[in-house]
């Protein structure tokens, strides 16, 4: 019998699913007493090189309110060619193509190893992928030049038949016609006035052909090219012309006087991009890629005025309700994001500037559409250049790692209902019998739209057990969930990926130890963290921390072993033991602590946390620390100030930064140049080892992390010191005659103090 850890691992590898509980409490009452909700992390397009897609349509349950897909959990009568749906128990005929099936000749979707299966379905004409570049020209010369080179480079990475378009903006917005005649023409719009989709389409001459397409199918083929030909062209036709056009782009010509910001019409430029795609290619895979080097300063969506003496809003301003443009700008971008999501398009934001660029207001454009958000200091850095290049990376099978216009539907057996989802998605408002009235995250629906996704995109999906306490589930009963993801593959094929999973029910009163042993503390920590970060968007920070603390105390009261009022007797079993420290680091993380971060930085961190898979999310919550020394091979060490020793090099991975920190002695040796002397070859290798390991992480991570190389006493050592558990501070340094580790100058509580308080509260009879 495999251990639960192995079971969890195998399921994640096969199905891309991690549940908080892997044996489910069998009644609503017992489930609420578990504190951590029944929920899962789902990576719909997890890479499975061993899973070739099948070239036929899935077989669906015939009950109109169910339509679940045939799967290995269904009961099959091979003689009568019937199958019973495991969700609604409807008996269904197999289609004629399945006439030859038998116990020894099963179709793939009935085999247990195909609990996840992918179908290629041909529905409607194939349309090429679309990339629309929206480029800010109010940049410094050096930055603009670097951005132009990156954009020119990207043309060679696009699929040859992809359509590409270009909009540039500064004080005015220019929509460029991309013809092959070599004459550059563009339509110019004022940046101060918002336009409706209809106005944009009329001005660009897009409305005429749109009517026949709606009514008569035969006209579609000849009319479609007319629409796109002027603004969106196949890259293989116009790559030379577009390369020249990008090369000739100039800085915004409007003079910027001393003490002023350039007038930047980002809000209207995005609005025109959304309107252009809405009128030409609704419900087709398309990316709007916004490159901006500063905040929007005029027109709808502006986040700050053009006077440099008035700084852009800070958290302090927002708390004091002193951010005068914020609400209006956020509303403008939310409207655009919802329109974009309705059309199945996604918006990427690449913001590179030393000051804030308005990501707080614009975040919904990427968050609701599944677009990327990249934040850097300048377009002329390897951080931006390599991250942008990775957008076009190819997977193990030589295909782009991007998919478009996905529709995720969740089906459950009758004892469960769906409470909601958290991730880069929007609700499709599909009500049904399996939708709960209690919402967690984006609820009230059993279907969500994810306009842009890749093999790492991960959603958190929350469930509610609705089975009544007095209606027991028969012994050995299993609950089931099916995830059906329909999407446009980067090869423009329509595909459907179906994952069907089942877990055992258990009576929490007589079989609590089974439920407890099957707790996945890593998944639970990430699922609770997502709920906390989701709440932090609309609630006060201290309230969210209090809520997380309360949940942690309740969990410890429920599953800890202790004598009343005796904190020293408190123990947590192995399947819960790491959970409190995840919560400790989450409380200190930039997702919940806005101190020392700008609103843009907080939005950026939260954006990535809401879409990464379990492994990356855990690194964000509790960074990984490796130590390199002469005492042995590199080893993971505690994220604690006691790990900072003079004769060690530390490598810390926080997901957003890779920090290499040289201990005091190592730094002195390096300054003395020992690594250059032949007799200290081993010291040279020691210095090189963390650099090689860091390089490996830098090669694969998206977005590329910031790389920090520092030493004891260096100004950038703060990146490490702010993350480690401050077990030794300036207050307790001399207690117990401690010698090891570095004291941290902080008033933050340490993990030890946190755990002591937690134990005290958990065992208290007053609680």
Swiss-Prot record:
Matches recorded under InterPro entries: ADF-H/Gelsolin-like_dom_sf (IPR029006), Gelsolin-like_dom (IPR007123), Gelsolin-like_dom_sf (IPR036180), Sec23 (IPR037364), Sec23/24_helical_dom (IPR006900), Sec23/24_helical_dom_sf (IPR036175), Sec23/24_trunk_dom (IPR006896), Sec23_24_beta_S (IPR012990)
Its membrane topology: Peripheral membrane protein
MF GO annotations: GTPase activator activity; zinc ion binding
SUPFAM superfamilies the record matches: beta-sandwich domain of Sec23/24 (SSF81995), C-terminal, gelsolin-like domain of Sec23/24 (SSF82754), Helical domain of Sec23/24 (SSF81811), vWA-like (SSF53300), Zn-finger domain of Sec23/24 (SSF82919)
GO biological process, alphabetically ordered: COPII-coated vesicle cargo loading; intracellular protein transport
Subcellular compartments: Cytoplasmic vesicle, COPII-coated vesicle membrane; Endoplasmic reticulum membrane; Cytoplasm, Cytosol
Binding site for Zn(2+): 61, 66, 85, 88
Pfam families xrefs: Gelsolin, Sec23_BS, Sec23_helical, Sec23_trunk, zf-Sec23_Sec24
Organism superkingdom: Eukaryota
Chief location of this protein within or outside the cell: membrane
Signal peptide: none
Any one annotated GO CC term: endoplasmic reticulum exit site
CDD domains: Sec23-like (cd01478), Sec23_C (cd11287)
Sequence ranges of the Gelsolin-like repeats: 634-720
Keyword list, A-Z: Cytoplasm, Cytoplasmic vesicle, Endoplasmic reticulum, ER-Golgi transport, Membrane, Metal-binding, Protein transport, Transport, Zinc
Primary role: Component of the coat protein complex II (COPII) which promotes the formation of transport vesicles from the endoplasmic reticulum (ER). The coat has two main functions, the physical deformation of the endoplasmic reticulum membrane into vesicles and the selection of cargo molecules for their transport to the Golgi complex.
Assembly: COPII is composed of at least five proteins: the Sec23/24 complex, the Sec13/31 complex and Sar1.
Family classification: Belongs to the SEC23/SEC24 family. SEC23 subfamily.
Name of the protein: Protein transport protein Sec23A
Taxonomic placement: Eukaryota, Metazoa, Chordata, Craniata, Vertebrata
